[in-house]
Amino acid sequence: NEYILEQTKTLTENKCLILINPNMDKNYIEGLLLKNNIKGFKPYRFYSKTKDTINCKILDFITEEQIEIADKFGLIIMMHLAKKDAIADDDNINDLIYLSDKYPNVKWILAHCARSYSAWALEKGIKKIRDLKNIWYDCSTVCESDSIDALYQGVGLEKIMYGSDDMIGRMRGKYITFGKAWSAINSDNHNLALSHCDDRMTFIRYEQLRAMKRGIRNSKITESEKQDLFYNNAKNLIDSVDSRN
């Protein structure tokens, strides 16, 4: 967090989220908010109190006390859902409904199309939360056009944002899906026989952009909606937060 805050201190156009874990003190968090231009929190499942990073629930890796702070200041909480079924998991659905209702000032971002690299989870689960007013989604590193199209169709473009995932997006490879599974493939982790074709891999970010383009083509959206998807939706969401008020 100190590094992120230092990088955004002098450039007012740069905004940041701070990393949160369940053990962080309330007074420490509020002190950071009052002194810095912080737009929200980023909890992560690897900090789960249960030590189970696969099947943990939302409140295992961020506490309600911390969510209360986000609600008080109207902050963003950007989150990677856990559990194998992601947004199709009943625990995740029920928790999002509960938290969205109890903390209406929190602006939730469900990263990676609600961590649904494959379309089936969105097709199964998104209809149960699509009417929640304070949930947004980003498309970062999702490389399947069917998944992105399912999100476009499921929640409407006004709640969706492009995300670059700067650490992963610059790597060469692709997130692939089969059945209910998904994984990142790169030149070092497969033994596919590819002598019959050009086996060079492009950047994951390019694969994501290609999937977004195909999803847009399928949805027949306007030029103005494209601008919203790639810029305006995110800017409007970020501009709606002032943690120091």
Predicted segment positions?
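Active-site gating/metal-coordination segments in enzymes
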Residues: 1-85, 131, 135
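Distinct, well-ordered alpha-helical segments
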Residues: 1-6, 26-34, 54-56, 86-103, ...
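Residues that cap or flank secondary-structure elements
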Residues: 57-58, 87-88, 140, 204
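Internal, well-ordered alpha-helical segments in soluble enzyme and binding-protein domains
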Residues: 62-66, 92-95, 106
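Active-site acidic short loop of glycosyltransferases
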Residues: 72, 104-105, 157, 232
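H/E-rich (His + Asp/Glu) clusters that bind or coordinate divalent metals
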Residues: 113-245
